[in-house]
């Protein structure tokens, strides 16, 4: 799976960078989590700082175009993002981490 960054837009007000990217894959469309991990590695960021919003694969193509928000800190992601987006990206809130450990 190869990831190419198409566009990066700084959003200093929300402490994030909006990223449009393209993924070329050999098999079926990769999962949201595997794309998130690969994009985080490409950008030298922690996976919890990356929130994948959209993945779009055209029928029959082995190319996926996506949109992600890359935060400066995981705390900013938890403060700004909606709960369902955090769930989809497996980003756990602070209160939930403590409940899981118990």
Swiss-Prot record:
GO cellular component, one term: ribosome
Signal sequence coordinates: none
GO biological process terms, semicolon-separated: translation
Keywords for this protein: Ribonucleoprotein, Ribosomal protein
Domain of life from the UniProt record: Archaea
GO molecular function: structural constituent of ribosome
The family this protein is said to belong to: Belongs to the eukaryotic ribosomal protein eS24 family.
Name the UniProt record assigns to this protein: Small ribosomal subunit protein eS24
Protein source organism: Haloarcula marismortui (strain ATCC 43049 / DSM 3752 / JCM 8966 / VKM B-1809)
Protein's gene: rps24e
